[in-house]
Amino acid sequence: MFGDINTSKTVCILSVYLNREEIKKTYLQPFGLDEDAFMALSLYQDPKTKKTSKAVLKEYTETELIPVLKEQNISYVLCTDAEYFKVLAGVMKVDTNVGYVLPCAYDPNIHVAYAPSYKSVFYDPDKAKPKIETAMHSLANHLEGKYKAPGDNIVKFAEYPNTLQTISDWLDKLIAMDCPLTCDIEAFSLKHHTAGIGSITFCWNESEGIAFLVDYIPIEGATEAPFGTKGYNKEVRALLANFFRRMQHKIIYHNIAYDAYVLIYQLFMKNIIDTTGLLDGIKIMLTKWECTKLISYLATNSCAGNDLSLKTQAQEFAGNWAQDDIKDICKIEPSKLLAYNLIDGLSTWFVHNKHYPTMVAEQQLDIYEGLFKSTTVDIIQMQLTGMPLNMARVIEVKAILQQDFDSAVKRISDCVLVQEYAYQRKLAWITKRNAELKKKRVDMADADAELLKPKNTVAWNPNSYPQLQELLYDVIGLPVIEYTDNKQPAVDGDTIAKLKNHTTDSRVLVLLEAFIDYTAVNKILTGFIPAMENAALGPDGWHYLFGNFNLGGTVSGRL
């Protein structure tokens, strides 16, 4: 309890850690909130596991937490644990819901808000403090009847031209405005040669802009997905190419290495090996530009890491404007797609206005204008150039690797140790099922039948880390010499190779060698060969493998 213990409480703070002074210092005192209205409860954590399961969280919430909240006549809950918040609010994500006060999934008379734990202020203050501030202001406003959800009324002017003439007129108006613009596209895929341009937006400030369809063709009368199909709008593409040629001011993107990369190919290149069009597009699109993803990286980078996505960087401004990330724009109604696209453009302005001054104040402007911008041009050119592949050789090498893979699988399957382990797994399944069943009994025949099902928990799977751990360390009895970041016994290829030095058993040595071969070949067959097989065919008869580089990540410039 806080304040007068005899006063009825309106708000309950839920926390895994209960420290009265830390809670007051973090959530109450900085915002001038009445302590008499608050109480706090600790949240149950399963002592047997590192992370409490969702099933346990739900059971505790339903049987213990909600009854107590009702008994205390609590109207608001400030939850400082992300997993409990998901259960209480009935949402899938936490960060996109910061600043929202949502009805409780178990009782609509209780409202729930999320704020990071006070402990996070110690190890990640730059991210935790703004989120706590946003959450507490929203909660206070809701208590006073002045609540406005994040993203409400951010659009002051929006136009969605839908004819060739109105699109042309608006592009002329944008040129006449003689000011910087933000630009964002929605496309059909992540690869430049299949992306097309579904829709595009241009915004001239944080609250005004336009958006229009390009290659997205609405399906007339559609009442369920798909709502559109992919086309090729030659006329609108020509207008866009001409617009970018005429544009004299900076255009601001969030992740220019995607948007401009797609636009260069779709508007200026005839095919995937059109180097003349590529260089022309680079000259047009990459002369005057800004990238708020790079700006955000330089303004917010810390040892604790940062999420550079537009949704995260602009969440306090636009809220949760898309419940799910768009994976297939044809499943989005055209009006919603355009509204979503427009808010992306407005949000890009917000992120620019928020982080650009910080980047300058942190003395990062020189590296941004120099190294980062010049590297970005190189990255986009590399992404559009690709690497030529001899597909006949790819097919040939795949067959060789498959032989090696099959050999490794056979050696593993033929090993008596593995056969015994697989048998023990079936026995364990039989024991577990019979303990669950009231009358019916299962036997080895049922276990064998279970093995035939596509998804089952009986089959021996060499790709399963828990099974490998059990086989190598529990069944065979090899020593644990390496651990994963999660403090689990390591079973990666390098560790398995080292384990050869810790046994003289010929059966174990043969098995370890088979695992080493299996791991190496499987990685190439599943990770590299499929990408090569899907390489794009160029007009010269060669296939081209294209990749993407991430500048502004933990490992910058990594393919």
Kindly give the residue locations of the regions a language model identified.
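Metal-dependent phosphoesterase core characteristic of DEDDh/y 3'-5' exonuclease domains
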Residues: 25, 89-126, 203-207, 257-332, ...
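Alpha-helix capping/helix-boundary segments
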Residues: 83-85, 258, 467
